[in-house]
């Protein structure tokens, strides 16, 4: 199962200036995130207080193309950095293979 550590950042130049519009946009995106959590695409998500940035943990059998499609739903308002991660067991397996 692939796991991803994703950092995200809202583009402040694209965020609505009006607080009501900005709140509506945030709510829409938060509901999209909640749906991804319910569907198992995202296992954890958080926003850094007062920064317009945060992180997400994704896991599953989702292909990179499908992950990219999901992230494109937030474009151009949010940018992402995606890092595929290994478990400690995978690191141990890699380490042992290096000693062969």
Model-assigned labels for residue ranges:
Residues 1-53, 62-65, 92-100:
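Short S/T/G/P-rich N-terminal loop/turn motif that feeds into the first structured element of a domain
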Residues 35-36, 59-93:
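An amphipathic, aromatic/His-enriched active-site/gating alpha helix that lines ligand/cofactor pockets
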């Amino acid at each position: 199962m692939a796991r991803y550590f994703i950092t995200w950042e809202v583009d402040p130049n694209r965020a609505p200036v009006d607080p009501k519009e900005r709140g509506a946009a945030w709510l829409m995106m938060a509901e999209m995130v909640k749906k991804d959590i319910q569907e198992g695409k995202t296992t954890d998500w958080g926003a850094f207080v007062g920064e317009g940035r945060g992180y997400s943990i994704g896991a599953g059998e989702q292909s990179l193309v499908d992950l990219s499609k999901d992230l494109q739903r937030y474009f151009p308002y949010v940018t992402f950095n995606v890092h595929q991660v290994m478990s400690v067991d995978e690191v141990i397996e890699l380490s042992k293979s290096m000693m062969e």
